[in-house]
């Protein structure tokens, strides 16, 4: 639970551009993981799919919160 709180605090400190970069990097890693799972016959740690997706969702949520704070 502590790691999640640290990630959230870290994401809240980032600028919009840094959040975009974080999202892009996580999407790229998720794509690579999916390709690795589909194209290779080696075992893939399937829990990483949900970790990447949740990290992306958290970053998008924080980005939306910042946008709402500015406009609302």
Swiss-Prot record:
GO terms for molecular function: structural constituent of ribosome. GO terms for cellular component: cytosolic large ribosomal subunit. Keywords: Ribonucleoprotein, Ribosomal protein. One of its GO terms (biological process) is translation. Pfam families: Ribosomal_L29. Belongs to the universal ribosomal protein uL29 family. PANTHER family: 60S RIBOSOMAL PROTEIN L35/50S RIBOSOMAL PROTEIN L29 (PTHR10916), LARGE RIBOSOMAL SUBUNIT PROTEIN UL29C (PTHR10916:SF0). This is Large ribosomal subunit protein uL29. It comes from Chlamydia muridarum (strain MoPn / Nigg).
């Amino acid at each position: 639970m502590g790691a999640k709180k640290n990630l959230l605090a870290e994401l809240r400190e980032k600028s919009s551009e840094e959040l975009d970069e974080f999202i892009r990097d996580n999407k790229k890693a998720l794509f690579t993981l999916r390709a690795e799972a589909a194209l290779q016959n080696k075992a893939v740690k399937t829990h990483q799919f949900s970790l990447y997706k949740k990290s992306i969702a958290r970053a998008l949520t924080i980005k939306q919160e910042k946008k709402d704070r500015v406009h609302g």
